[in-house]
Curated annotation (Swiss-Prot):
Plays a role in the regulation of phosphate uptake. Its main location: cytoplasm. It comes from Pseudomonas putida. This is Phosphate-specific transport system accessory protein PhoU homolog. Homodimer. InterPro entries: P_transport_PhoU (IPR028366), PhoU-like_sf (IPR038078), PhoU_dom (IPR026022). It is found in: Cytoplasm. GO terms for biological process: intracellular phosphate ion homeostasis; negative regulation of phosphate metabolic process; negative regulation of phosphate transmembrane transport; phosphate ion transport. The lineage of its organism: Bacteria, Pseudomonadati, Pseudomonadota, Gammaproteobacteria, Pseudomonadales. NCBIfam families: phoU_full. Keywords: Cytoplasm, Phosphate transport, Transport. GO terms for molecular function: protein homodimerization activity. One of its GO terms (cellular component) is cytoplasm. Belongs to the PhoU family.
Length: 256
């Protein structure tokens, strides 16, 4: 099992420093992406086109951070040829930056919708749903990054588990908004913008789950991607929760 002390166990202090540096760069990128999501949701709800424009301007900075971290990972792989937990750390970082960059892309899409709605000048139906789901997704991103910083597989598991709640609430909100558009066709254009913003939030939740799965891989050494939640819980907690899955008991199927 890996923890923060694992980053300082190498004979080469330079290798220790390189691992800690690339990890800190990932977390710095994560902090900027987290702020980008916060600002995008706030800009949409409060009709703040200036804040939305700031979110869009940060996107290139996020892209550059992704490129820089990729280069660091390649350099470490080439020079140090890491193995075991060190290799898992580099793999987890190199994959997590992809999800962070895509979270930034989704935040930028929300910001674009915010600017569009500001130009139309009327608050559409659906802001309650945006605020509610937005708060939950922001918490998921924060917890996924905290789990990475603390090498906390249990916290990472809770993020993966919560993604199902986001998916369920997104579908509920979508049904309500479609019904509203059918009742008031004049609202279609504006409400569609809110629906696309909600879709971006749901995708951000998916990317937060991806990062949490990488944390579990990093800490436990088990690739839990594409696992159902029962089996993933068993891997993290070391229990036999997956027995029902293996036996294929009716009514015990587990959605991802």
């Amino acid at each position: 099992m890996i923890n923060k002390e694992s980053l300082t166990h190498h004979i080469s202090q330079q290798f220790n420093a390189e691992l800690e540096e690339v990890r800190s760069h990932l977390l710095a990128m994560g902090g900027l992406v987290e702020k980008q999501v916060n600002d995008a949701v706030t800009a949409l709800i409060e009709a703040d086109s200036g804040l939305a424009q700031q979110v869009r301007e940060v996107d290139e900075q996020i892209n550059q951070m992704e490129r820089n971290i990729d280069e660091e990972c390649v350099r470490i792989l080439a020079r140090r040829q890491p193995a075991a937990s060190d290799l898992r750390l580099i793999i987890s970082i190199s994959k997590s930056v992809i999800d962070l960059e895509r979270i930034g892309d989704e935040a930028t899409k929300i910001a674009r919708r915010a600017i569009q709605l500001c130009e139309e000048g009327e608050s559409p139906r659906g802001y309650v749903e945006v605020r509610h789901i937005g708060d939950q997704v922001r918490n998921m991103v924060r917890d996924a990054l905290d789990a990475f910083a603390r090498f906390d597989a249990d916290l990472a598991l809770s993020v993966a588990q919560y993604d199902k709640t986001i998916d369920r609430e997104y579908k509920t909100a979508l049904r309500e908004l479609v019904t509203y558009m059918m009742e008031d066709p004049r609202s279609i254009s504006r409400v569609l913008s809110v629906i696309w913003a909600l879709r971006s939030l749901e995708r951000i939740g998916d990317h937060a789950r991806n990062i949490s799965e990488l944390v579990i891989y990093l800490v436990r050494g088990t690739d839990v991607r594409h696992m159902g939640l029962k089996r993933m819980t068993a891997e993290v907690q070391g229990t036999a929760v997956a027995d029902a899955e293996k036996a294929n008991v009716p009514g015990e199927s587990d959605d991802k």
